[in-house]
């Protein structure tokens, strides 16, 4: 079969690469993709993620069996609804089901309604009311833009002043446009964060290995929030009993709740969780695979990914099998200045071979050659599997030391929480 992946980042590179491993898959197209993907035999289609009718026409003309949608903004724009109306299958939630991600307030209301553990909160569109709530609650406190903001719409404020300023930027200064026209202000939860993913169709779901992401830009969890600077799986200090509790108290009730609400869920459900003294609680839901978690989870899958997704799409039982030993770890290399203003056009090191995989995100070919240049905030990610976190760190970081990363930066402590 021929498949289409919508998106352009490292996540979509990992999805397409894994689908291409299937003996049943003849071709994988990515729209619009990035030039780095072509080094793995992936074909790029020059159609943007918002061009739904062009994507639908391409899928029809090229006999695409189904489409895997990567990015949150495409889902929020109703791409899956449009494909389904055209009689095409797409793996991803409808616009209404994806509201779990594109409105933090909606997600909070659903969690309250169905008794799902999460932080106490208030939602505000009026700055003075938000300010009064912050002053009443005190700090630390978390201020979130209600809508999509590329993973950068969350401020963990250490002081009341910092929280008020974050609310002011969103509500009065229009920092995130319509996405920040409402803010959700939450109690700060202390604990270990982890990412739980499930492949879902209605009440049928399959839990993936649990990963830990590193959101802050710099070592020691310093600096601004980013889309993610690295991740690893498995999380050795997270007992299976915690995952089981999260499935019972969070995943099952949210999926049942969405069915009750008439928003039955299809696709990847991503629960960003935190292990508190009261057990796991939800920080956020996302309606798609995480980036960079996808790049470390999918290499551990030993079953046929294309067959698994095909089965789930058609509501057939499927069997996902995984590497059950060792650790897979990945480090993101980003452009200097990210997540704020960053440089572009930096020459990238050669693609790695052997047991270190390179997944590309912001990369393009130079005008007159096949040299890859940086073309985004997060540029590429190196991923490897080893017996222990330390072994994986050693492999990745020794490779990075040998690369010319002028104009780029990366965190040097990915996975270190697991080796304390």
Curated annotation (Swiss-Prot):
Free-text cofactor note: Binds 1 Mg(2+) or Mn(2+) ion per subunit.
E.C. designation(s): 6.3.4.13
GO molecular function, one term: ATP binding
Reactions mediated catalytically: 5-phospho-beta-D-ribosylamine + glycine + ATP = N(1)-(5-phospho-beta-D-ribosyl)glycinamide + ADP + phosphate + H(+)
Binding-site list for ATP: 134-195
SMART domains, per database record: GARS_A, GARS_C
Keyword hit for Manganese: yes
Keyword field contains Magnesium: yes
HAMAP family named in the record: GARS
Protein's UniProt name: Phosphoribosylamine--glycine ligase
Biological source species: Streptococcus suis
């Amino acid at each position: 079969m021929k498949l289409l992946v919508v998106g352009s980042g490292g996540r979509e590179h990992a999805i397409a690469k894994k689908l291409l491993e299937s003996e049943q898959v003849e071709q994988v197209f990515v729209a619009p993709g990035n030039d780095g993907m072509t080094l793995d035999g992936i074909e790029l289609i020059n159609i943007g993620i918002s061009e739904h009718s062009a994507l639908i026409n391409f899928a029809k003309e090229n006999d695409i069996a189904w489409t895997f949608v990567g990015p949150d903004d495409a889902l929020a724009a109703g791409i899956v609804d449009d494909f389904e109306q055209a009689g095409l299958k797409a793996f991803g939630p409808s616009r209404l089901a994806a509201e779990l991600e594109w409105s933090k307030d909606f997600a909070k209301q659903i969690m309250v309604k169905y008794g799902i553990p999460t932080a106490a909160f208030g939602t505000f569109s009026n700055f003075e009311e938000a300010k009064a709530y912050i002053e009443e609650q005190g700090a630390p406190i978390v201020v979130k833009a209600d809508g999509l903001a590329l993973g950068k719409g969350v401020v963990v404020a250490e002081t009341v002043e910092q929280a008020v300023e974050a609310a002011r930027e969103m509500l009065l200064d229009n920092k995130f446009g319509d996405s920040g026209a409402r803010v959700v202000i939450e109690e700060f939860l202390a604990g270990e964060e982890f990412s739980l993913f499930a492949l879902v169709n209605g009440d049928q779901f399959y839990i993936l290995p649990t990963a830990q992401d590193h959101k802050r830009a710099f070592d020691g969890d310093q600096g601004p929030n980013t889309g993610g600077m690295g991740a690893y799986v498995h999380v050795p200090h997270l007992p299976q009993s915690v995952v089981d509790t999260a499935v019972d108290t969070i995943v099952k009730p949210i999926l049942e709740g969405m069915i009750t609400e008439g928003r039955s869920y299809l696709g990847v459900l991503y629960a960003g969780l935190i292990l508190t003294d009261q057990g796991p609680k939800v920080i956020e839901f996302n309606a798609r695979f995480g980036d960079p978690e996808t790049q470390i989870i999918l290499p551990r899958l030993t079953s046929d990914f294309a067959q698994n997704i095909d089965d789930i799409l058609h509501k057939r039982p499927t069997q996902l099998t995984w590497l059950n030993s060792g650790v897979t770890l990945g480090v993101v290399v980003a452009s200097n200045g990210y997540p704020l203003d960053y440089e572009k056009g930096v020459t990238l090191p050669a693609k790695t071979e052997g047991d270190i995989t390179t997944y590309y995100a912001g990369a393009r070919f130079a005008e007159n050659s096949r040299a890859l240049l940086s073309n985004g905030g997060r540029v590429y990610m190196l991923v490897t599997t080893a017996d222990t976190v330390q072994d994986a760190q050693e492999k990745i970081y020794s490779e990075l030391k040998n690369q010319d990363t002028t104009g780029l930066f990366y965190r040097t402590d990915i996975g270190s929480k697991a080796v304390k």
